[in-house]
Amino acid sequence: MAAAVHGALKAVGEDFYRDAIEHCRSYNARLSAERSTRLPFLDAQTGVAQSDCYIWMERSHRGPGLSPGQIYSYPARCWRKKRRLNILEDPRLRPLCDAPQKKELGSAVAEGAVLEALLCAEPPKEPKEEEALLDCQKPPPGDFAHDAEGDEMEDDAPRRKNKAKGKTYGLGAVRKRQDAAALEDRDKPYVCDICGKRYKNRPGLSYHYTHTHLAEEEGEESAERHPLPFQRRNHHKQFYKELNWVPESQRRHAAAAGRRSEGPCDFCVGGAVRRAALGHEEMIACADCGRAGHPSCLQFTLAMAAAARSYRWQCIECKNCSLCGSAENDEQLLFCDDCDRGYHMYCISPPVAEPPEGTWSCHLCLRQLKDKAAAFITLT
């Protein structure tokens, strides 16, 4: 060993060898100090949770061996448990901590006495209020005769515990209903002005208008043309017609539509009313976005303008199918040349693959105008 060391000293020089030994010693000292202060971590390569194991000792900790063949022994590190806050050590907090335990102990003793009395087939001594409550909760004679003793053993204590909860049940139910109503108002912002039903999107509301209120109007017109032997019970609608009275919801809708149509025309930026070549001309407002335009700017005939004012007319940006209520696939929409309603080519009956040549009229205009419809005039 000594010969090897002397050979290394002669080869590299004594100063270089001494510096190398010093650097090695300092590196080992730094590594040992770093390991002793290293925090626990998860090794990403091995997946092992590495933590300080306290096996790194100093030279001053060495002691003589305690067993045969042992050269050194080191003192065992004491296991230290972290102290936690114990509120029972404070004498001022002890009464507050003992109060719930006494209450639970008292309730447990009371329940134990009741159960013991039930097991002994002796009626428990209860206040009159609890006796009246139990009499009201007894099943009628026609019910199935279950084991009454077992039912009382299982249900007697929960009934007494839930007795105080009945006072606040009404307030909680009212609060839940109010929260549900507010949530519905937020989830369904589109409201029908006629019946008050709410929808999540505008196409659903338009579908509701078309298939509910428009269908009711068509049914009333057909009933007037073909009177039935019995009288309908819609006396309030006939009463409104006789008095020339409009419901409040419809008046609000009409007033809102009138306010929206007071703006300028989106095409000519003119006023709400202007003198056209055909005479006095009023703008038509979209029922969804409120944008308006003159019939001549929209290239409407007099019949189309009159028909557009008879229902919830929509502009080209808001137009959706009058049958399915959807605004998707707008390239498949057909527009009626009499009322300007939109229909998908696959929604009409019979469905068509290509738009028809010339003018086209929807089934509503064909039913109402008959031989005066634009499609009928084109065919003739």
From Swiss-Prot:
Zn(2+) 4 binds at C318, C336, C339, C362, C365. Its main location: cytoplasm. Transmembrane segments: none annotated. GO terms for cellular component: cytoplasm; nBAF complex. Zn(2+) 3 binds at C321, C324, H344, C347. GO terms for molecular function: zinc ion binding. GO terms for biological process: nervous system development. InterPro entries: DPF1-3_N, Znf_C2H2_sf, Znf_C2H2_type, Znf_FYVE_PHD, Znf_PHD, Znf_PHD-finger, Znf_RING/FYVE/PHD. Keywords: Cytoplasm, Metal-binding, Neurogenesis, Nucleus, Repeat, Transcription, Transcription regulation, Zinc, Zinc-finger. Zn(2+) 1 binds at C265, C268, H294, C297. Pfam families: DPF1-3_N, PHD. A zinc finger (PHD-type) spans 262-321, 318-368. It comes from the Eukaryota. Residues 132-164 are annotated as: Disordered. Zn(2+) 2 binds at C286, C289, C315. A zinc finger (C2H2-type) spans 190-213. It is found in: Cytoplasm; Nucleus. Component of neuron-specific chromatin remodeling complex (nBAF complex), a subfamily of ATP-dependent SWI/SNF chromatin remodeling complexes. May have an important role in developing neurons by participating in regulation of cell survival, possibly as a neurospecific transcription factor. Belongs to the neuron-specific chromatin remodeling complex (nBAF complex) and plays a role in neural development. Belongs to the requiem/DPF family. This is Zinc finger protein neuro-d4.
